């Protein structure tokens, strides 16, 4: 196996340039090195000005989302050896404003996420002495896969609807709202309806499915969105047929 590989890294330094450029770096190559290891080597040994996000290095925190050879990937879970003989082109996630180099502005996602109330909503609280809220394995399975989301935002980078319409609520936010709607302990489905069923919510999705393909945790946001469309349509039909109490 080759012992070196070239990484072409997108650089954007707003104080000295008006648009991103690419800079090539040659880094050591071992089978164990992820793209994040290559970037860390560049920062530590070749160019300390390179900026990028990372935290856990284990594909859990979701911090290292980037565009690698054109695909939305976690840099910590994507290996340099898979791109031999190179080069490996590393760019920021798409559909987000670039702050510097590989660092993007995620404030739009962070502002939208609370709107779906991604937490357990209870309108009645049983006495503490009644104990915890118990679930059967089947009740857990109903929402478990959607709870695996790590907020890496790769689904937003992959989503053609979000690329065209930044007002779109987006795959992860809708899937997380649906995660709690499907939780037997939650009572907040009606509280989320105005946001999830809005024109910029689930109905804006055109079911391209790139979000589900991009998810590093196997979450199916596209499936969650289509299921919610059915829920929203059923509710709307009930309201039409039974306006005095259609739920």
UniProtKB/Swiss-Prot annotation:
Enzyme Commission number(s) of this protein: 1.3.5.1
Details of cofactor binding: Binds 1 [2Fe-2S] cluster.
GO cellular component, one term: fumarate reductase complex
Location within or outside the cell: Cell membrane
The entry's keywords: 2Fe-2S, 3Fe-4S, 4Fe-4S, Cell membrane, Electron transport, Iron, Iron-sulfur, Membrane, Metal-binding, Oxidoreductase, Transport, Tricarboxylic acid cycle
UniProt catalytic activity: a quinone + succinate = fumarate + a quinol; a menaquinone + succinate = a menaquinol + fumarate
Binding site for [3Fe-4S] cluster: 159, 205, 211
Membrane association type: Peripheral membrane protein
EC primary class: oxidoreductase
Cystine pairs: none
Residues that bind a menaquinone: 12, 226-229
GO biological process: anaerobic respiration; tricarboxylic acid cycle
Residues in 4Fe-4S ferredoxin-type domain copies: 140-169
InterPro entries, per the entry: 2Fe-2S_ferredoxin-like_sf, 4Fe4S_Fe-S-bd, 4Fe4S_Fe_S_CS, Beta-grasp_dom_sf, Helical_ferredxn, SDH/FRD_Iron-Sulfur, Succ_DH/fum_Rdtase_Fe-S, Succ_DH/fum_Rdtase_N
Family per similarity comment: Belongs to the succinate dehydrogenase/fumarate reductase iron-sulfur protein family.
Protein name as annotated: Fumarate reductase iron-sulfur subunit
Organism per entry: Mycobacterium tuberculosis (strain ATCC 25618 / H37Rv)
Gene: frdB
